[in-house]
Amino acid sequence: MFSTSAKIVKPNGEKPDEFESGISQALLELEMNSDLKAQLRELNITAAKEIEVGGSRKAIIIFVPVPQLKSFQKIQVRLVRELEKKFSGKHVVFIAQRRILPKPTRKSRSKNKQKRPRSRTLTSVHDAILEDLVFPSEIVGKRIRVKMDSSRLIKVHLDKAQQNNVEHKVETFSGVYKKLTGKDVVFEFPEFQL
């Protein structure tokens, strides 16, 4: 039998905590029993967190390595359904584990000879987190509303076709995004007239 940490690979060889081991164990059980076996065998996760969203609800964020994100997304709808059954209805979201490199300043410029890639900038990482969050729905538009006190509210327009699948999770998405990035976001399903 595999150990509970078989499905979790932490960066820098850290030990997974109890909650992460539980998620890893659940993924292992799914791999053993379900017809997702072939797809799940190659995949692992890097971290997992449980956060509170909107009062009493809890959500589980599972971080996966960026190269494996596409493979996870192929089976994500079924995987999420199975995991939500296991964890008694807590919403589960998959997000790729990305790194943000600091903006080069005059002082720090000499240290890093390489130019910072666009994919490691804060803006790019935050946008990518948003896209991972709402999968399988797609973002079709975005509006940023700056209020008089200069606080920002991001309105994200999601694909109307997926409204039935993701509408009940919209509050969770907002809570998770606020927790990870500190930004307020509202999701809408606009009717587009051509």
UniProtKB/Swiss-Prot annotation:
The places in or outside the cell where this protein is found are: Cytoplasm, Cytoskeleton, Microtubule organizing center, Centrosome; Cytoplasm; Nucleus
Q: What is its main location?
A: cytoplasm
Does this entry carry the keyword S-adenosyl-L-methionine?
no
Which Gene Ontology cellular-component terms appear in the entry? 90S preribosome; centrosome; cytosolic small ribosomal subunit; nucleus; small-subunit processome
What keywords are assigned to this protein? Cytoplasm, Cytoskeleton, Nucleus, Ribonucleoprotein, Ribosomal protein
Pfam families attached here? Ribosomal_S7e (PF01251)
Cell division as a keyword?
no
Q: Which InterPro entries match?
A: Ribosomal_eS7, Ribosomal_eS7_CS
Q: Which molecular function terms from Gene Ontology are attached?
A: structural constituent of ribosome
What is one Gene Ontology biological process annotated in the Swiss-Prot or TrEMBL record? ribosomal small subunit biogenesis
| Top-level taxon in the UniProt lineage | Eukaryota
Q: How does it assemble?
A: Component of the small ribosomal subunit.
Would you identify the family this protein belongs to, as annotated? Belongs to the eukaryotic ribosomal protein eS7 family.
Q: Which PANTHER family match?
A: 40S RIBOSOMAL PROTEIN S7, SMALL RIBOSOMAL SUBUNIT PROTEIN ES7
Please give the function described in this protein's UniProt entry: Component of the small ribosomal subunit. The ribosome is a large ribonucleoprotein complex responsible for the synthesis of proteins in the cell. Required for rRNA maturation.
Q: What is this protein called?
A: Small ribosomal subunit protein eS7
Q: What is the lineage of its organism?
A: Eukaryota, Metazoa, Chordata, Craniata, Vertebrata
Give the gene symbol: rps7
